Amino acid sequence: MKDWEQKKVASPNQPPPAALEEAKISGTCGSPRTSPEPHDPGGSQPLTPRMESHSEEEDRPGAGGGLGWNGRSPRTQSLGACSAEAMLARKKHRRRPSKRKRHWRPYLELSWAEKQQRDERQSQRASRVREEMFAKGQPVAPYNTTQFLMNDRDPEEPNLVPQGASHPGSSGESEAGDSDGQGRARGEFQQKDFSEAYERYHTESLQGRSKEELVRDYLDLERRLSQAEEEMRRLRQLRGCTNWRPCYQVEELAAEVERLRTENQRLRQENEMWNREGGRRGGQPGS
């Protein structure tokens, strides 16, 4: 024991190994380094065996069974703190905007094809939901749509004649009637399709214009309407004048014809009279 105390007294400036290990660990983990307490070279108090044994117990890994944070060595505690900080830094999540954004556009700004696609998707989704509800036994309502409004705008005359009804007549007449009916139905379908396409195009063109352009178009239409009405009035007046002139001319011509006929008859009578008188005069000297 005395030899051991003499060794410690002989090297008072040498720090204990536990302090060296703790300084290394604190330097690696980024914790502030604490300067060790200066030892008095004059030999104030040498290290006692109790302190040395305590430091040796802390240096031994797994002292006290290795259970609990208080029973661990300073190196183990420092490593645990470093691992916890690294785990927190690794788990830190920064929210970033999604790369795939859905740009919503109002229905009025969509083109006709995009409107058709959206309506088709909505109808398919509604049909799928209705099928799921029907499979679960829940009451299902009809799909809500505004197509009936468009149908009411162009009402068609009902077909009072049933398709299976037979008409009296020959087979040729029935075939001709069927072909005429099919051609009429095809023509009506084409006319309706053209009207719908024209209405869609006109609606899209109006929706794409500003308020000033719409006002300017409205004033232009009013000006053209007034010009058309004035032209129609002038044509009606001209037609009335042309219809009145031929009648008047016909009456004048008829009167002229009647006057000429009367004059011709008078001249004919005078000619006959002069011929008779000339014949009489020619017969007297010869007798």
From Swiss-Prot:
Compositionally biased tracts (Basic residues): 89-105
UniProt-annotated stretches for the region Interaction with P-TEFb: 142-145
Residue numbers of Phosphothreonine PTMs: T34, T48
UniProt entry tagged with the keyword Transcription: yes
Region of interest called Interaction with CCNT1, HEXIM1 and HEXIM2, as start-end residue ranges on this chain: 227-287
Coiled coil: 208-278
Record-level GO BP terms: negative regulation of transcription by RNA polymerase II
Residues where Phosphoserine is found: S31, S53, S55, S73, S78, S83
Described function: Transcriptional regulator which functions as a general RNA polymerase II transcription inhibitor. Core component of the 7SK RNP complex: in cooperation with 7SK snRNA sequesters P-TEFb in a large inactive 7SK snRNP complex preventing RNA polymerase II phosphorylation and subsequent transcriptional elongation.
Quaternary structure annotation from Swiss-Prot or TrEMBL: Homooligomer and heterooligomer with HEXIM1; probably dimeric. Core component of the 7SK RNP complex, at least composed of 7SK RNA, LARP7, MEPCE, HEXIM1 (or HEXIM2) and P-TEFb (composed of CDK9 and CCNT1/cyclin-T1). Interacts with CCNT2.
Protein name stated in the entry: Protein HEXIM2
Organism per entry: Bos taurus
Gene responsible for this protein: HEXIM2
